[in-house]
Every structure is written in structure tokens, then in C-alpha cells.
A protein has these predicted regions:
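N-terminal helical cap/lid subdomain that shapes the substrate entry/recognition surface
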Residues: 1-57, 68, 72-73, 160
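Asp-based, Mg2+/Mn2+-dependent phosphohydrolase catalytic module
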Residues: 27-32, 49-53, 59-174
Length: 174
């Protein structure tokens, strides 16, 4: 009986490793429900406004995000909407990361070539890998979801890796 439970657990762990996103079918199979995302619990990383202020003096800033409807309002409520020149939200576009189409659309709409853009993200699978595939430079922030991931192959290796958002300033402003 103990051995059967161990095998079942190992099987579940293998399934979830293969299916990193924990899709609805897997959740249903195991009798689980996907928790609703709570936008009221969202917070900014420390010094976000100051960092955006500094970067905005040197760069055009944009967002490519898998977000629920209302992203612009949430950015406005945080007091950071005006720092961004372009916002590409999956809820508005019907495209989502890691689909390279959302990255290509953002580059096209901003008249930016891939080698001129830098993707800063906390997810290897949704941010770093697809941006690298289309030729963008990448910075992986090991903060938030990023703190849980580990680089497993060259495709997942960002051009720069930092521990927190403030660490991007020496890279981008030097």
C-alpha cells in the first residue's frame, strides 16, 4: 500500500513536471481546482517607480503580459501607467506568452527590431525562452515566480540574470 502511494505520487510529480502550467485537464484529473487570481493582492516590487523613472529617461518602456482584463487600470492605480509607451496584454489581444506572436506583435507595433529590445521577466518559460527565440536580449529576474525556477538548458539561459529588479539598473544604465 505504501509502495503504491509512492508510485502514484511519483507519477503525479512527473505529470506536473511535464505540464509546467498545471492545465485545467490535469487539475481536473487530480480533483483540484485552479485558484482564482487575486488582483487585489498584487504589489509592486520595491523601488519600481524609481527604476521605471530612471529607465524611462534612456529607453522606451513596454509591457508584454499574460494578464486579466483591467491591466491598464491596475497600472494606473499603482501610479506607474505613464511610464509605459506600449502595453500588450493577453486579455486584450487574444494572444499569450509564450506564443512568439505576442512578442512579434509588440515589436511590430513599436517599430522595434528584436536585437534592439530587451525582455525583462521572471519566468523562463513565458519570458526568457520565447524572447530569445525571436532574437531579443533577455534579463531574468529571480524574483517572484522566478525564484522557484532553475535553468535546465542553454535555451533557458538569459543574457543576464539578476536577483531583484533594482539589479537591472547597472546593466542597462552603464
Amino acid at each position: 500500500n505504501r509502495r503504491r502511494r509512492q508510485r502514484a505520487r511519483a507519477s503525479r510529480e512527473r505529470d506536473f513536471r511535464k505540464n509546467k502550467k498545471g492545465d485545467l485537464e490535469a487539475l481536473s484529473f487530480y480533483g483540484l481546482e485552479r485558484p482564482a487570481w487575486r488582483t487585489d493582492l498584487e504589489t509592486l516590487y520595491p523601488q519600481t517607480k524609481e527604476i521605471l523613472e530612471q529607465l524611462g529617461q534612456e529607453y522606451k518602456l513596454g509591457i508584454i503580459a499574460n494578464q486579466l482584463p483591467g491591466l491598464e487600470q491596475r497600472l494606473k492605480d499603482f501610479g506607474i501607467l505613464d511610464y509605459f509607451d506600449a502595453i500588450f496584454s493577453s486579455a486584450d489581444l487574444g494572444l499569450a506568452k509564450p506564443d512568439p506572436a505576442i512578442f512579434r506583435l509588440a515589436l511590430q507595433k513599436t517599430n522595434c527590431l528584436p536585437h534592439q529590445a530587451i525582455m525583462i521577466g521572471d519566468r523562463l518559460d513565458n519570458d526568457i525562452v520565447p524572447a530569445k527565440r525571436i532574437g531579443m536580449k533577455t534579463i531574468w529576474i529571480k524574483q517572484g515566480f522566478g525564484s522557484l525556477a532553475q535553468v535546465k538548458n542553454l535555451e533557458e539561459r538569459a543574457d543576464w540574470t539578476v536577483e531583484k529588479l533594482t539589479d537591472v539598473l547597472p546593466i542597462l544604465l552603464s
